[in-house]
Amino acid sequence: MASRENEIIRPKANFHPSVWGDQFLVYEEPEDQVEVEKMVEGLKEEVRKEIVVALDNPSKHTDLLVLINEVQRLGIAYYFEEEIERALKHIYDTYGDHWKGGSAPLWFRLLRKQGYYVSCDIFNQYKDNTGSFKESLTNDVHGMLELYEAAYMRVHDEVILDDAPVFTKTHLAKMLKDSLGYNPTLSKYIQDSLERPIRKRLPRVDALHYIPFYEQQVSHNKSLLKLSKLGFNLLQSMHKKELSELFKWWKHFDVEKNIPYMRNRFVENYFWALGAYFEPQYSRARIFLTKVFAFATMLDDTYDAYGVYKELEIFTQAVERWSLTCLDALPEYMKLIYKELLDLYEEMDDTMAKEGAPYHVKYAKEAMKEFIGSYMTEARWKHEGYVPTTEEHKAVAFISSGYKMLTIASFVGMGDIASEDSFKWALSNPPLIKASCSICRMMDDVVGHKEEKERVGGHVASSVDSYMKQHNVTEDHVYDLFNTLVEDAWKDLNRESLICKEIPMVLKMRLINLTCFIDTLYKYEDTFTNVGPELIDCIKSHLVHAMSV
């Protein structure tokens, strides 16, 4: 048997080991935790009163929008979800599409983000008689930034907003160049905005960028600033505790010994789940999603970077049966993966059943089976040397991107807000999930194309390969096309987040946040597979370095 095993030619990916070691294994609670929690409660009341006062006074409705924007960007909106919803609903009910206050782009962005489908016609006032944006707009840097950010909430056929990114980027880049010498704070802010608009940013990452900028503003609200810093540190402590508990679970796998071929990215898996929801009330859901992310990585590398065709067939059949009676039929290295996968879902199923919501895990399990089945289809293509058509690839890649399965997993443990109808909706391949999966698949395939082509043992044909072969074009042509299609998919995502009534906005935000994380990981290169300084610094900012108060 040993000689036969040695004869097996396996793919070889040579992934680098984890960069974190056991850094997050031990958690120590801050000594001043209770005192900080009391301070936070007092500051929350101050801010809550400010929101109520501004809401009750129509002349202060523009100030109200500014305050809500600051609360959101400082990363403390989760303290005031009810107040923000009440305020924005009042704004929408009062003005409809005919906003009378200032900061029209801010009004547009905040209401669309909240799910109110306000018209983009308000931006007609920004155009001159020739249909071009007024040059006078370029004299107001903050107004240009607001217009730039609003444009990324657009949907298809909103021509005025399609023109806005080019106009604003051009002039903001010039402002950036001109401001370098005298306003480094503003320069950094513009640079960050041009790198990634708010719509594509993870809220917690945005807060890390915005807090230092906000602190430099002379007019900043001291209560807001202090609350944002204390709140950040409180949550960081909670997240570190979660990661410590999760790390103990992960150590049980002994990856270096039992699954040495996989990318050991457990800290990055947790950070990914943190991107979906960082708020304290979703701790249980976040812990479960982290474990699902870990299995998704494990399975991806098993199917793509180690397993041979016959082994993968056996494993896929075992997953379809979902029974420990299949364990003996599996190759030795797959037994641990299979058993732990079933145990994870069974444990969560028991927990949810006690709460009267057994359907949570039932649908998550179906999504996992479908996900693994799509990997098997791709393994078959690779085994047969088959390059599928673009249409064939798209049908399978929608599932193999993992984002449908992960979206459904992200609902598990969120409580009553995730109804059985929500799970049925997600499993039915709705347009909102299709848009997210398209963004994930295309961005991943573009950055991974060249690297994976060099892998020993080959790699399944990606969507880039399929399009190149079918249309006889270069890879650079496909990269440019896919980047355009990603922007189109964002328009689909924006529209569906506005018109989809089957699930509440709080569930839609899980999907939107997961999509934002793709932009964080795969904008220029695959920073999940090849963890570099930028991602390391980002994770340290979230999970290592407390914020100075």
Swiss-Prot record:
One of its GO terms (biological process) is diterpenoid biosynthetic process. Mg(2+) 2 binds at D300, D304. GO terms for molecular function: germacrene-D synthase activity; magnesium ion binding. It holds the Pfam family Terpene_synth. Highly expressed in leaves, stems and disk florets. Detected in roots. InterPro entries: Isoprenoid_synthase_dom_sf, Terpene_cyclase-like_1_C, Terpene_cyclase_plant_C1, Terpene_synth_N, Terpene_synth_N_sf, Terpene_synthase-like, Terpene_synthase_metal-bd, Terpenoid_cyclase/PrenylTrfase. Its EC number is 4.2.3.75. Its cofactor is Mg(2+); Mn(2+). Mg(2+) 1 binds at D300, D304. It catalyses: (2E,6E)-farnesyl diphosphate = (-)-germacrene D + diphosphate. The keyword Lyase applies. This is (-)-germacrene D synthase.
